[in-house]
Amino acid sequence: YSCKKALYSTIPTIEQLKLSKQTLKSNDPKDSLLISFYVYDGDADLGVDRNSGSYDIYMDESRTIQNLRFYFPEINGAIPGAGKGIEGLCNVYITGKQLKIDSTVFPKSADTLYLKVYVVDKAGHKSNTLFTNPIYLK
C-alpha cells in the first residue's frame, strides 16, 4: 500500500469569483444574477448535514442587512477519486427578492453592496474569503 497525497489542502479554497451582472432589481423575484466560483477541497468533505444547523456556502452582505446561506447539491454515492480531493464550479443564483434596498435610515431608491463569499466543509474548515464586485440595487 502506498499513501497518495491529496492534490489540494484539506481546507477548502475558492477562486475566480464572478458575477453575471452587477445591477439587480430590488425585491423582484424574477430578476436574478449568477455568482460563480471554483471550489477545491483536498479531502472532498464538502456538503454538511442539512440538519446540523450549518451551511456550505456563506455570502455576507457588506451592509449587514441580510446574510445569505446555501447548501451544495447532495451527491449520492461515492465520488470517484475523492481521496485525491475534489474540485468543481459552483453556481449560485441570487434573486432581487433576496437583496433589498436598505431604507431603514432614510428612504432611497437605489443601494450598493458587496458580498463576502466563503465555504465551510464538514470538518468545519473555513475557506479563504473572496469579495464580489459592487452589486447595484435599483
Model features per residue range: what roles?
Residues 1-13:
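Bacterial Sec-dependent N-terminal signal peptides
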Residues 12-138:
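First exposed extracellular module after export/assembly in secreted or surface-exposed proteins
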